[in-house]
């Protein structure tokens, strides 16, 4: 990196350094991540986060290491509903694998960065477990679930500048030890602590779309679709599926953002947290976004968003002057100061109709539900204005609108003013949706 690039990166990252300081992050490290050749760099980056004043809880899994140890000892695991049935022999090997990882992670975190203080890593009985019991006639034996989390104790250590380390085994009040899914621990700890972020790692740079391209942003409903795909493909235990399970649950419970990154690419953690767009997949409700009416200050961003679509002939060209005149008609989605989606609501009062026009979503966010969010916002605004029918003219997205309750219509069904200016050369399809609740 050249010196000018380094200076620019520092300047761009400063707001995020200030934003993250004092916040609580829960970091999931599964067995694949720990076994990767890049793990030492991930640990170093975690240490750097701690030095920047971020409160960290590391929750680690050991499935890969456990399976390897079981195979070496000719022990075969039985699964029921995707949960390992842990008998006493299996538990001894689980404890061996987990104990080794706990020591290794602590040792690596204890390696001091130059001119930095020694890290205090705390691993204790913060989790109390209880047996899962019997389900459909199957006894899970020493496979357990969370009974209680000592949240106040965890907070005490975080406030005293310690990193809290949690593994996938926990004691019970009766003195037994149970094997727990590490994603369940990460989920419940993040929720109970009201963490700012949940962070996980996988072999891919986030969740990939069908073309193999990383999806930068997902809403919970979109994430659930990808999770179902992994499950249907028999990949219930893959890193992506286990992260999505946790991320969807914590997101619904109020954790603002979850991030899935590649454990193979050096620096992913820092790039995700200290740049605007990151490198992996972020799951959020929409806390980083603002859905609002556009103002004249938004016109440059609107032009940047819609110009490529105008060039492709997907949208009708609009002059800057026209945008200025109609700016109050536009609803936009603003993500950290960047307009990533827009739609206009043009009224025709005489017929009590309105057009949803100039619908555009930034390419990086088209695999998410931003279109649905815009449609809901436009529908809500139209109803507030007393509009009875909403219509669209489109050359490319007929099916998308039909799936959302619009019906094909004719030119004669348009308001007179729109009908008189209909462009027969574009041959846009006309779709109309009644907005009355009873319809």
Swiss-Prot record:
Keywords: Acyltransferase, Amino-acid biosynthesis, Arginine biosynthesis, Cytoplasm, Transferase. InterPro entries: AceGlu_kinase-like_sf, Acyl_CoA_acyltransferase, Asp/Glu/Uridylate_kinase, GNAT_dom, NAGS_kin, NH2A_AcTrfase. It holds the Pfam family AA_kinase. Its main location: cytoplasm. It is found in: Cytoplasm. GO terms for cellular component: cytoplasm. Its EC number is 2.3.1.1. Pathway: Amino-acid biosynthesis; L-arginine biosynthesis; N(2)-acetyl-L-ornithine from L-glutamate: step 1/4. Gene3D superfamilies: 3.40.630.30, Acetylglutamate kinase-like. Residues 289-429 form the N-acetyltransferase domain. One of its GO terms (biological process) is L-arginine biosynthetic process. The keyword Cytoplasm applies. The keyword Endoplasmic reticulum does not apply. It comes from the Bacteria. It catalyses: L-glutamate + acetyl-CoA = N-acetyl-L-glutamate + CoA + H(+). SUPFAM superfamilies: Acyl-CoA N-acyltransferases (Nat), Carbamate kinase-like. NCBIfam families: N-Ac-Glu-synth, PRK05279.1. In bacteria which possess the bifunctional enzyme ornithine acetyltransferase/N-acetylglutamate synthase (ArgJ), ArgA fulfills an anaplerotic role. This is Amino-acid acetyltransferase. The gene is argA.
